[in-house]
């Protein structure tokens, strides 16, 4: 919770100063400010005996699957909310930081960040291929959080503007799923 408050404070300071941080400055704070780490910790509380003290210690060690899932959340969010957040006055996002740091166009920044999202998915897949201290159900929880971000942010901001597209996606996953034969 302290890390989340520090990240919010850092982003507020950048906003108030009109400062566009480097990617190396921005991403660590921005990934924390998604609240993803806190959400993933709290989500383990309802999993029963499968979650042990060792599981929490594993989670607090900042494993690659959690970092990758949180990065997917931040990158996909910034890619689709950039224009809306600029209109309402918001801290510089990943796109702004990337454009300034590398001197590229908005589209080039978006393309590079989409590639980073793909790389984060590869990291998640890699974590399923090698043994970890975490139970499989916990790994699946991290995977599912990343899937939710993909559902909400692929192509549009389904979190801020929930509409027919998101409702249809949710219905296709839970109400009318494809049967597995």
Regions found by a protein language model. Name each.
Residues 1-181:
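Alpha-helical, largely C-terminal catalytic domains
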């Amino acid at each position: 919770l302290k890390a989340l408050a520090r990240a919010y404070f850092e982003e507020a300071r950048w906003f108030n100063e009109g400062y566009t941080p480097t990617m190396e400055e921005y991403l660590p704070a921005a990934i924390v400010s998604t609240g993803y780490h806190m959400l993933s910790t709290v989500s383990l509380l309802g999993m029963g005996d499968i979650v042990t003290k060792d599981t929490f210690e594993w989670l607090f060690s900042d494993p690659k699957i959690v970092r990758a899932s949180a990065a997917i959340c931040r990158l996909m969010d910034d890619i689709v909310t950039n224009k809306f957040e600029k209109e309402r006055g918001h801290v510089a996002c990943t796109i702004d930081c990337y454009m300034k740091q590398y001197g590229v166009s908005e589209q080039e920044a978006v393309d590079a960040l989409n590639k980073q999202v793909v790389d984060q998915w590869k990291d998640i897949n890699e974590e399923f291929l090698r043994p970890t201290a975490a139970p499989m159900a916990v790994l699946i929880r991290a995977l599912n959080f990343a899937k939710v971000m993909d559902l909400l942010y692929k192509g549009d901001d389904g979190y801020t503007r929930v509409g027919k597209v998101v409702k249809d996606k949710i219905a296709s996953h839970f109400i009318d799923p494809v049967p597995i034969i």
